[in-house]
């Protein structure tokens, strides 16, 4: 494979999806090239390394020299998103104010469609027996109404330890005005050393709205171990291979941040991959003279839609990912767990379904010739003639 890029320093962007990993390199003259390889769901960092090896082969450069000449290295990842969509996160324990343990499951008590009484909500991330109440109360003005009982926290720790909890979320009433109780609970959790991963709502999302704050903190705890393990390992691999600049992560709001911040707040990465599309849409809009566009990005696991109106893409602090309600600054993207690699089937009632499980980096027993009996959306499009067999992505992948 040849490439048109020639002269360092390099600017590198890499996006890891559930199915493919895409690497974009820009050289000092602004020339760009794209490299696509299959992702490695068991270790997404291997997909990044594989894409880098492909690029280095095209450039005829040793890896260490290439990475050493990188001006910056920006990474967008759907690891957090796919962890949530596919239900493959950590076992989470939740500590909440006594009397409010069911807020996470009760949600707002409202349905988006008042006439739809049958569509279930997504599974609650923390089962009731792992939602443990803590005596103590902070009032809306920040004053202490009832003293905190740390013995409740220690009792909950025993339950969490016995059940193998991997990550703990703490969300107490009105902690966004006074975090003293949450700070004390977090200190006990660190002393008890049940697990490494602790998410405290007053650190993650110190805003009004008990349900949304609790939901956001629970999601953060749910995806944290997998995301942190991935990012830490990837950064160390890149450093060992010669990267001298910082690894930056693209956030849901379209900005970039270092790993130090995001390892503890991975909820800000839920739209890390698709938020990069905002820049592409704005660039395209300027080129064709259009200020109103709709962008739809269908990956292997999810589908992301965003709207540009009058040349601007909205930023929101209210986000819903697969019906999990979150409060985190993000590009106004709407995401559902349905992509090209989504597995379809027939349920016990004889009804057709698609998702939420995806085929990962081996999509399609028919489309990609990997064998198996579980068809995906891409298989259906190929069999129905909506997609043509043959090479795609510059010949890096081929549909049978």
Residue locations for each model-derived region?
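N-terminally biased helix-coil "hinge/interface" segments that flank
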Residues: 1-400
């Amino acid at each position: 494979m040849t490439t048109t890029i020639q002269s360092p320093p390099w600017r590198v962007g890499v996006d890891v999806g559930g199915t493919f990993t895409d690497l974009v390199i820009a050289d000092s003259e602004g020339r760009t090239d794209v490299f696509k390889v299959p992702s490695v769901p068991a270790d997404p960092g291997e997909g990044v390394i594989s894409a880098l090896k492909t690029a280095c082969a095209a450039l005829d450069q040793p890896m260490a020299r290439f990475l050493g000449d990188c001006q910056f290295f920006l990474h967008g990842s759907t690891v957090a998103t796919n962890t949530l969509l596919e239900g493959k996160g950590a076992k989470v324990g939740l500590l909440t104010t006594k009397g409010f343990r069911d807020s996470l499951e009760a949600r707002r008590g409202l349905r988006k469609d008042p006439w739809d009484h049958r569509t279930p909500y997504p599974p609650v991330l923390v089962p009731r027996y792992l939602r443990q109440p803590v005596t103590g109360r902070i009032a809306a003005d920040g004053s202490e109404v009832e003293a905190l009982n740390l013995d409740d926290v220690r009792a909950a720790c025993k339950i969490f330890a016995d059940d193998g909890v991997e990550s703990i979320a703490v969300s107490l009433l009105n902690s966004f005005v006074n975090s003293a109780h949450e700070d004390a609970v977090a200190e006990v959790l660190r002393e008890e050393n049940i697990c490494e991963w602790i998410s405290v709502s007053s650190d993650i999302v110190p805003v009004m709205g008990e349900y949304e704050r609790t939901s956001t903190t629970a999601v953060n705890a749910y995806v944290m171990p997998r995301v942190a393990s991935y990012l830490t390992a990837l950064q160390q691999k890149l450093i060992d291979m010669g990267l001298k600049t910082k690894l930056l992560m693209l956030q849901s709001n379209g900005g970039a941040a270092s790993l130090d911040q995001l390892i503890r707040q991975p909820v800000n990465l839920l739209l890390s991959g698709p938020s990069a599309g905002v820049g592409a849409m704005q660039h395209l809009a300027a080129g064709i003279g259009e200020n109103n566009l709709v962008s739809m990005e269908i990956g292997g696991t999810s589908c992301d839609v965003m709207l540009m109106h009058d040349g601007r893409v909205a930023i929101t602090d209210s986000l819903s990912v697969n019906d999990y309600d979150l409060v985190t600054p993000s590009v106004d993207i709407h995401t559902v767990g349905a992509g090209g690699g989504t597995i379809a089937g027939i349920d016990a009632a004889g009804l057709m379904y698609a998702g939420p499980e995806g085929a990962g980096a081996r999509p399609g027993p028919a489309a990609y010739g990997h064998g198996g009996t579980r068809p995906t959306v891409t298989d259906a499009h190929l069999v129905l003639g909506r997609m043509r067999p043959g090479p795609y992505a510059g010949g890096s992948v081929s549909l049978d």
